[in-house]
Each structure stands twice: as structure tokens, then as C-alpha cells.
């Protein structure tokens, strides 16, 4: 029986699931928006939100905790220098999941997961203004 077990299995072993979610979290922090299946996006949100909460206060212990989960110095630096101060006044809900239809091969529901206060690139608008 499956009583009191949280999270999704996503048809993977636990080690594969953990490494996949770490890689997806790194991609989300790097690009600030990624496209994935809806269930993976919902599971990724459970991983990403506590990391952003830790990155709001820049202490050595918080840096070590975040590094133990992410394992990439460049992304940890970006979290504490750029993303943490950006989300300092927000109490939670750092990510947004937007449904974007179904995948053509197997009709799996797809979604974009993005950081809420991300800076959008408006290169087209800058070119049009010139």
C-alpha cells in the first residue's frame, strides 16, 4: 500500500529521479524558463522553491546547503547574487507553471515552468525603438 508517501515516481528509480530533478533545477536556474511535462514541472516545483527560500539570505550555511543540492558553483553564485535578492520580499510561490498543450508523439501534457519575477529579454522592442 502507498500510504503517506509524497511525491511522484515518474516511472524511474529513485537515483535516476533525483539526478533528473537536480539537472532540471540547474536548467531552470540557468535559463529561468524550461519546457517539460506537466507532472515533471509539478515535481520540480517541490525541489526549486525551498532552494530559492534558502538563497534569500546569504550566509555560509545556506550556501553550503544549496551547494549540497545543486552541486554547481556558478548556479549557486547566481542564486545568491541575482535571484535571492530578487525574491527577498516574496514569501513563496517563486515559480509559475503554464500549460502549453500536448506533445505530438505520445500526447503527454506539456508545460512551461518559469521563475515569477524573471527579467524578460525584449531585444525586439529595443530594435524597434531605434
UniProtKB/Swiss-Prot annotation:
GO terms for cellular component: cytosolic large ribosomal subunit. InterPro entries: Ribosomal_bL17, Ribosomal_bL17_CS, Ribosomal_bL17_sf. The keyword Ribosomal protein applies. Part of the 50S ribosomal subunit. Contacts protein L32. Belongs to the bacterial ribosomal protein bL17 family. NCBIfam families: L17. This is Large ribosomal subunit protein bL17. It comes from Buchnera aphidicola subsp. Acyrthosiphon pisum (strain Tuc7). The gene is rplQ.
